[in-house]
Amino acid sequence: MSIPTRKIGNDTVPAIGFGCMGLHAMYGPSSEEANQAVLTHAADLGCTFWDSSDMYGFGANEECIGRWFKQTGRRKEIFLATKFGYEKNPETGELSLNNEPDYIEKALDLSLKRLGIDCIDLYYVHRFSGETPIEKIMGALKKCVEAGKIRYIGLSECSANTIRRAAAVYPVSAVQVEYSPFSLEIERPEIGVMKACRENNITIVCYAPLGRGFLTGAYKSPDDFPEGDFRRKAPRYQKENFYKNLELVTKIEKIATANNITPGQLSLAWLLAQGDDILPIPGTKRVKYLEENFGALKVKLSDATVKEIREACDNAEVIGARYPPGAGSKIFMDTPPMPK
């Protein structure tokens, strides 16, 4: 089977990518041996659009990928995305957001060093501080492209206004947002992120396309999440919201059974059916789930099934914020105007 694809800039990548975050952050520990095995299996499958960040494991994720490049010699097979924006105070360990041009250059050089490469395919602003005008940020990133250190520029969790202003300075190749049957906020007219991306021919890269695993049907109680797992803190998965939100999962499970696929594959196939500009990046630490997720590329949903899932989403009331208090304030961020 030829692998369905999506466009990032002038490049063609698999229509389902691999989110590397879970190897080092949010969902508990994983061994180096297991991480390297998953990366190799992803490459062998043809799942070669990888997504990292300098924040995942505070550099450990990039270093792990760098070791894989060095050990396998397969750098050229991978379209690699990573991100900057979070700065860690070396003395206090406190995190803050920094989008200033001098910090961008510093963060990029550190990422290149950790990865052991001289150019990153797609470099995202991970989160916005709300203090630096997007025009300044894009100007700095444009210089990084011209220097040959990055190939394409991406944004993440920003406002529609920020997307439009950014695209007026230099092409934006991807915007990364949470998008799934469980999180449809980007479609809302008052948020307008999907509309802004489509106006500017920007690929929408979807993180947490399985609702952080919730849409797979694997979790039937809040107690099913391991100790130290991010979902134990996120409001959407708390006891007071969990069972109400599970109603949508139950509907998706039922539709998946009728189509002889897993709930996760149904969710991913439904996302892909939303447009040729939609590119989900599910993450996992296990080869079994990697194969299941990438297998969603073989699924072709009927128009009736796509409509049935849309109706289930429309009739579901998803309750609880995506992030714990504090972190959620950096969602759909705007940036200040350029000083006159």
From Swiss-Prot:
Self-association state and partner proteins as the record states: Monomer.
EC numbers for this chain: 1.1.1.-
Catalytic site: 56 (proton donor)
Residues binding substrate: 126
This protein's UniProt keywords: NADP, Oxidoreductase
Alphabetized GO MF terms: aldo-keto reductase (NADPH) activity; oxidoreductase activity, acting on CH-OH group of donors
Organism annotation: Schizosaccharomyces pombe (strain 972 / ATCC 24843) (Fission yeast)
Site (Lowers pKa of active site Tyr): 83
Keyword Transcription: no
A Gene Ontology term for the protein's cellular component: cytosol
Name of protein: Aldo-keto reductase yakc [NADP(+)]
Gene3D superfamilies, per database record: NADP-dependent oxidoreductase domain
Family per record: Belongs to the aldo/keto reductase family. Aldo/keto reductase 2 subfamily.
UniProt KW RNA-binding keyword: no
InterPro entries the UniProt entry points to: Aldo-Keto_reductase, NADP_OxRdtase_dom, NADP_OxRdtase_dom_sf
Residues binding NADP(+): 208-218
